[in-house]
Design a protein with these regions (language model features):
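Conserved nucleotide-binding and Mg2+-coordinating catalytic segments in signaling enzymes
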Residues: 33-53, 75-89, 97
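A short pre-motif secondary-structure segment
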Residues: 112-115, 156
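Active-site-proximal alpha-helical element of nucleotidyl cyclase-like catalytic domains
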Residues: 91-110
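Active-site-proximal structural segments of metal-dependent nucleotidyl cyclase/transferase enzymes
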Residues: 54-87, 114
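Catalytic-core segments of nucleotide cyclases and related cyclic-nucleotide turnover enzymes
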Residues: 89, 134-138, 142, 146-153, ...
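Residue-level recognition of strand-loop junctions within catalytic nucleotide-signaling folds
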Residues: 85, 124-128, 167-168
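Signal-transducing coiled-coil linker helices
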Residues: 2-41, 49-60, 111-112
Length: 199
């Protein structure tokens, strides 16, 4: 009788442990699926799927009047195609990773940073004083960019184009239209960098 009880207790303990490990495995699997779906594998930033979710969430909060100020920033590397053609895609990837690091170091504590396409990035900053956050972030970005470009034996400099808008429903109507406005300013900046007007 005692042996039967002991065997029963052991079976229950083993069953409980198996269920616990299954739960842990399911959680790990769930975390891994989430990471694959919403995290950019190359840079570690949130990816386009995460960006689209955040854009939708922000639009809903704006529609409800729950957001006072919204800053939208867009960033794009200059000359990635030339870097890839001249030095190879792995060298270009290193520049993309460095670009992501610089943007995240400049804006990551204040906002949400995303890699939305090959060499294109976006940042949403929600809260008070977004213009100041932008100005401070761009100063930091330029400082980090200059620091990287002083790397010995660097084959190609890193040049990051940027543009921003502060959301205003009268001007833009939707977050999507505001993003287009930030895109336009970013491409103007990229052209100025190519012409040497911005260092």
């Amino acid at each position: 009788m005692r042996t039967a009880i002991l065997i029963g207790v052991v079976i229950l303990a083993v069953d409980s442990l198996c269920k616990l490990f299954e739960g842990i495995k399911e959680t790990e699997l769930s975390n891994k699926v989430f990471e694959i779906k919403y995290k950019d594998a190359l840079t570690g930033l949130a990816n386009r799927n995460a960006y689209e979710l955040k854009e939708k969430e922000i639009q809903e909060k704006l529609d409800k009047g729950e957001i006072d100020e919204l800053l939208i920033c867009k960033f794009d590397m200059n000359d990635l195609r030339k870097i890839n053609d001249n030095y190879g895609h792995s060298y270009g990837d290193r520049h993309i990773v460095k670009c992501a690091e610089i943007i995240n170091q400049s804006f990551g504590k204040s906002g949400y940073t995303f890699r939305v396409d090959g060499d294109e990035f976006a940042v949403f900053v929600i809260g008070d004083g977004v213009e100041y956050i932008y100005e401070r972030g761009i100063l930091r970005l330029k400082e980090l960019e200059r620091e990287f470009n002083r790397t010995p034996n660097l084959l190609a400099p890193l040049r990051i184009g940027y543009g921003h808008v502060i959301y205003n429903s009268d001007t833009f109507g939707t977050v999507e239209k505001a993003v287009s406005g930030a895109d336009k300013k970013m491409y103007e900046c990229k052209d100025m960098i190519k012409k040497g007007a911005i260092v």
